[in-house]
């Protein structure tokens, strides 16, 4: 049968496999690839190819990640799988592979393990919104009651971290069985993908979200006024619309009187466009790099937050020494550095290069902030850590 041409008309969703080491994440990824390729919806990727994940540099951090793509009847998926636990932590914190949802792989023979817990916690912290559970190695468990016990444990663990544990789909399968073509387990992989199709919603496209543009530069155009430039992160801005300037200084309102791209005047700019926005009645000194233009009321300025942070190792160009509570580096948000003071969690004396940690931060100026916003921690322009806002506290 001839390979069908990739239908780009299907909605696109980013997912990944998460879970404890040796519970079968990579085997499951390979099984999904094989089962869907047998249906003509994917090109098969073998376990060895996924396992030998290439090294990637994301913001200077070395991460091993395997990316594969496949389709179901309903959707096109990009799927990410990491060989090592450290790679998962880095991947999730840096947002190197944004996930709209995840498949949590738990070995039915072993039940939830420490990394199962850590991956669920990380998913909660970095904003992976939906999880589907796959109990792998179910063929190794004779006792139906034991399977039910493991399922219950996983559901309780998910509930503990704020996921709807009782409602999450749980599929019992055997990825090795599916790879070997055993019909019963092939069916379970199809059932898993059906659950992913139906339970993980298609994400809202960037262009449908409320308008936001980080300001990179500010100019005055004689006779026309102040122009700010930047890349539209999300949403649409139309000429004549009211917008807010948020961050660093008190929030002000203004009106967009013009949109320019490549020296041409447009009626609107949208997510992904590099544009200049002409602001009515705004003086050049009233706006600066590091602020954002946003749909009124859609985002607010904050100074205090909790962040989930990965600290670069010496080999990744990070610090050679630990840091302590009271550390005052620069926090790079979107387009600018802002000094902030770090408080470590109770009982944590210091943070070593290579660690991941939840820290509390107080910035010296407020910035437009929301949960899930990524940042870098820098010293003298050099990135020493990467993080994501997990909770806004003030």
From Swiss-Prot:
Using the UniProt annotation, give all residue ranges assigned to the region (G1).
Answer: 19-26
Binding-site residues for GTP, renumbered to this chain = 19-26, 81-85, 136-139
> Locate the tr-type G domain: which residues?
10-204
**Description of how the protein assembles with itself and partners:** Monomer.
| Alphabetical UniProt keywords | Cytoplasm, Elongation factor, GTP-binding, Hydrolase, Magnesium, Metal-binding, Nucleotide-binding, Protein biosynthesis
The similarity annotation says: Belongs to the TRAFAC class translation factor GTPase superfamily. Classic translation factor GTPase family. EF-Tu/EF-1A subfamily.
Return the EC number.
Answer: 3.6.5.3
Tell me which residues bind Mg(2+).
26
Q: Which organism is it from?
A: Fusobacterium nucleatum subsp. nucleatum (strain ATCC 25586 / DSM 15643 / BCRC 10681 / CIP 101130 / JCM 8532 / KCTC 2640 / LMG 13131 / VPI 4355)
Region span, G2 = 60-64
A GO MF annotation of the entry reads: GTP binding
Q: Which gene encodes it?
A: tuf
Which residues lie within the region annotated G3? Answer: 81-84
Name-wise, this protein is: Elongation factor Tu
G4, as annotated region: 136-139
EC main class here is hydrolase
Region G5: start-end pairs: 174-176
Q: What is its main location?
A: cytoplasm
Q: Which reaction does it catalyse?
A: GTP + H2O = GDP + phosphate + H(+)
The residues forming the signal peptide are none
């Amino acid at each position: 049968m001839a390979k069908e041409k990739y239908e780009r008309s299907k909605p696109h969703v980013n997912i990944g496999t998460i879970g404890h080491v040796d519970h079968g994440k990579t085997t499951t990824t390979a099984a999904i690839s094989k089962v869907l390729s047998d249906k003509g919806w994917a090109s098969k990727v073998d376990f060895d190819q996924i396992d030998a994940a290439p090294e990637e540099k994301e913001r200077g951090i070395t991460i091993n990640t395997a990316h594969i793509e496949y389709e179901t009847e309903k959707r096109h998926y990009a799927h990410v799988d990491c060989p090592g636990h450290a790679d998962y932590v880095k991947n999730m914190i840096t947002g190197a592979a944004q996930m709209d949802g995840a498949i949590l792989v738990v070995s039915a023979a072993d039940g939830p393990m420490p990394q199962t817990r850590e991956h669920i916690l990380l998913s909660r912290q970095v904003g992976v919104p939906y999880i589907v559970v796959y109990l792998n190695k179910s063929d190794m468990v004779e006792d139906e009651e034991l399977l039910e016990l493991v399922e219950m444990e996983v559901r309780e663990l998910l509930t503990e971290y704020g996921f709807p544990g009782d409602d999450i789909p749980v599929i019992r399968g055997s990825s090795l069985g599916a790879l070997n073509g055993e019909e019963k387990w092939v069916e379970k992989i199809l059932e898993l993908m059906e659950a992913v199709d139906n339970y993980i919603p298609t994400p809202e496209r960037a262009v449908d979200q409320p308008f936001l543009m980080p300001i990179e530069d500010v100019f005055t155009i004689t006779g026309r006024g102040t122009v700010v430039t930047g890349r539209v992160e999300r949403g649409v801005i139309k000429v004549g619309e009211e917008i807010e300037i948020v961050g660093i200084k008190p929030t002000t309102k203004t009106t967009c009187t013009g949109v320019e791209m490549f020296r041409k005047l447009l009626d609107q700019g949208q997510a992904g466009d590099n544009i200049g926005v002409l602001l009515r009645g705004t003086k050049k000194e009233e706006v600066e790099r590091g602020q954002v233009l946003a749909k009124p009321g859609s985002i607010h300025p904050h100074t205090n937050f909790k962040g989930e942070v990965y600290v670069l190792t010496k080999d990744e160009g990070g610090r050679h020494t630990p840091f302590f509570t009271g550390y005052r580096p620069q926090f790079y948000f979107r387009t600018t550095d802002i000094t902030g003071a770090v408080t470590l969690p109770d009982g944590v004396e210091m943070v070593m290069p290579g660690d991941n940690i939840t820290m509390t931060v107080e910035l010296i100026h407020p910035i437009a902030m929301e949960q899930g916003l990524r940042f870098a921690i820098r010293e003298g322009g050099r990135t020493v850590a990467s993080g994501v806002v997990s909770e806004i506290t003030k």
